[in-house]
Amino acid sequence: MAFLASGPYLTHQQKVLRLYKRALRHLESWCVQRDKYRYFACLMRARFEEHKNEKDMAKATQLLKEAEEEFWYRQHPQPYIFPDSPGGTSYERYDCYKVPEWCLDDWHPSEKAMYPDYFAKREKWKKLRRESWEREVKQLQEETPPGGPLTEALPPARKEGDLPPLWWYIVTRPRERPM
């Protein structure tokens, strides 16, 4: 049961939400007609909502375990996997053709003039990122435990009154200074 590999690091709420999403995705594979899918999805939502406010964690954990076992027995043998998702037919297929963003810096001014709004906004973001990069890295280093992150959750948002975080697409890359 590979889907439980990160189980100890997730909260109960995260486990329930992931189970619900997996169940809906498998239900989508069973019910290809949209109206039938919607009907059974509403029934499933009602089953989850029935125990939403459960205060007893022992009972809630037992319910989650039973729900995961039921999901295991009722899952689709060949669930639909989106082509660009991991395990899909086109996963990472076209990454070699994607042009990195820094290539836009080499555009000729006449080419940039065709998209003035985009390049004006892009220059503002680049300037903002250059100005706040050191603070971003410092904040991430302060909030990351010495042994590395203990969960797969992303770091929290910035402190109140500060700029929004700019690391949403850099979070999986090494922390080098941006261009």
Curated annotation (Swiss-Prot):
Q: Which family does it belong to?
A: Belongs to the complex I LYR family.
Q: Please report the name of this protein according to its UniProt entry.
A: NADH dehydrogenase [ubiquinone] 1 beta subcomplex subunit 9
Upper taxonomic lineage:
Eukaryota, Metazoa, Chordata, Craniata, Vertebrata
Which InterPro entries does the protein's record reference? Complex1_LYR_dom, Complex1_LYR_NDUFB9_LYRM3, NDUFB9
Q: Which domain of life is it from?
A: Eukaryota
For this UniProt record, the keywords arranged alphabetically read as follows:
Acetylation, Electron transport, Membrane, Mitochondrion, Mitochondrion inner membrane, Phosphoprotein, Respiratory chain, Transport
Q: Which PANTHER family does the record match to this protein?
A: NADH DEHYDROGENASE [UBIQUINONE] 1 BETA SUBCOMPLEX SUBUNIT 9 (PTHR12868:SF1), NADH-UBIQUINONE OXIDOREDUCTASE B22 SUBUNIT (PTHR12868)
Q: Where are the transmembrane segments?
A: none
**Sequence positions bearing N-acetylalanine:** 2
Q: Which sequence positions carry the modification called Phosphoserine?
A: 85
Note whether Mitochondrion occurs among the keywords: yes
A GO BP entry: mitochondrial electron transport, NADH to ubiquinone
Its GO CC terms are: mitochondrial inner membrane; respiratory chain complex I
Q: What does this protein do?
A: Accessory subunit of the mitochondrial membrane respiratory chain NADH dehydrogenase (Complex I), that is believed to be not involved in catalysis. Complex I functions in the transfer of electrons from NADH to the respiratory chain. The immediate electron acceptor for the enzyme is believed to be ubiquinone.
Q: Give the start-end ranges of region Disordered.
A: 136-162
Assembly and interaction partners: Mammalian complex I is composed of 45 different subunits.
Q: Where in the cell is it found?
A: Mitochondrion inner membrane
Give the way it sits in the membrane.
Peripheral membrane protein
What would be one Pfam family of this protein?
Complex1_LYR
